[in-house]
Amino acid sequence: MIFKNLISLFFIGLATAIRFNLTDLECSRLRGPHCGTYLLKVVGTNATYVGEKSFIGLDALTESKGEFFQRMLEQEPRLIPRLFTIAENDTANFTPLTFTTYLKTCNPQSIENAMIPFVNTVTSEISFDAWAYTAQNSSRITGLSNQLMNSTLYNVQVATCTPGFSALLLDSPTINVFNNEEGMPSWCQPIELIPVCPLDEGFN
């Protein structure tokens, strides 16, 4: 989805970035006193989590059943795209994501796969990635999981955004990663995430 020349229009209203690091996490009820499996909760909410919504792409709807099931068996990511978002746990078509920590440091190590959109200031459009890099003008640090969870260290900003296509397609905001020097468009709001233990939140 391309929004050429649209980004600059909305850069009039800029938001202040929130930076935070998730290190030395503690979740005593899972895998030892420090390291474990976590959910990411949005600060200031009761039950809003980071997760993903899925939808069937237009190309999948126009092909034969045989081709569809073949692509599904091959686990083709483009068949049923999963978009990174935030929502309450009981939201339809939404699944909270979990992330694991590195045993030696207890720092975030990996997250389940989902597409994450970002504003690309090089091409002036909204682009997508699958946990690889932030944008073409970024420092190209691999491992978007750590970029997202340790935004101060990697000089990135985390925000929820509501471009028109997201509201119409998924009825939920996207979660975007911005470079440190980028101004946030007026349709974006910075957020802070906190790690929570799944069992403490009622997840089994």
From Swiss-Prot:
Protein family: Belongs to the VEL1 family.
Pfam families associated with the record: Vel1p
Protein name: VEL1-related protein AC977.05c
Any single Gene Ontology cellular-component annotation: endoplasmic reticulum
Keywords: Cytoplasm, Signal, Zinc
Cell compartment(s), UniProt: Cytoplasm, Cytosol
Organism in which the protein naturally occurs: Schizosaccharomyces pombe (strain 972 / ATCC 24843)
InterPro entries referenced in this protein's UniProt entry, alphabetically: Vel1-like
Stimuli inducing this protein: By zinc depletion.
Record's signal peptide: 1-17
